[in-house]
Amino acid sequence: KDNEALQKEISAFIGQEAMHTHEHVGFNASAQKYGHDVAKYERQTGVVIQTARKLFAKVVKPFGMTQEMVDLTATTALEHFTATIASQLLVNHHIQELMTDSTMSTMWFWHAVEENEHKAVAYDVYEAVFGKGVKAYALRSSALIFAMTLIFIAPSSFVFNLLKEDKKLN
């Protein structure tokens, strides 16, 4: 609370997350129009997130970690990972050429820039709480491995189901 610049970054982050939620609602409504059961995927995502939170909290509890610390660590890891993917969207012309819908490409470019900003804010908060030492690095690295596993498993399942729904699964 003593760092005014960080507090401003956090406030901007919260505002961007509200906008992010608004965009997801619009995206989900569009997907719903095409017959996708968005509510089902949201429920499944919620179960995965809550299960992962509890599991990771149990693993790191012996090291004095609270649920809030776990949540911050997970946020930092996930923001880093999504920003890494987002940066590819911003620089990879092949990916950009695949996006033929101008409304969707505009939304994804905005999202990519936002994710890069979020990574910086999440890391700044993480560093303010945990510092820069070996323990902070080890925690951040283990959370990233955990997050990458979840990010691989959950979306892969969703893509499989979406392809199945679209009858494009061979």
Give the positions of each predicted feature.
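Non-heme di-metal
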Residues: 1-170
